[in-house]
Design a protein with these regions (language model features):
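Nucleotidyltransferase catalytic core that binds NTPs
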Residues: 1-114
Length: 114
């Protein structure tokens, strides 16, 4: 059975039940297709990208980070990666995805961006 890593990026502002439903639906889909869902990586976007879409938003990255941790902490195979939220570690989504994909593919997993 081939391992698969699922990748979700987005604002998650705010995170809600349909985000979780989407994750579970994708996990179920790939499990049904015969894959072992090794992990699901959730990556909230940098706040700057949200400011382009919405006007008048307050910067609430700490609040959003707490929401994600509280909402997803019970699920062992869901990993939250905050690197794109943080200006110091933000290398850009395209490079971030490419680096993750190279890492998991080189270790024998299939990497799927949802």
């Amino acid at each position: 059975m081939q391992n698969v890593v699922l990748f979700f990026a987005g604002s998650f502002y705010p995170i809600h039940i349909n985000h979780l439903n989407m994750i579970f639906a994708a996990q179920h889909h790939f499990t049904k297709k015969g894959f072992n869902v090794q992990k699901t990586i959730v990556v909230p976007s940098h706040f700057g990208s949200l400011e382009k879409k919405f006007t008048g938003l307050e910067k609430k990255d700490d609040y959003r980070q707490c929401q994600l941790l509280n909402f997803l902490h019970d699920y062992e195979n869901i990993e939250i990666n905050f690197d794109l939220m943080n200006s110091d570690t933000n290398i850009g989504l395209r490079k971030f995805v490419a680096d993750l994909k190279n890492y998991y593919v080189s270790n024998g997993s299939k990497f799927i961006q949802i």
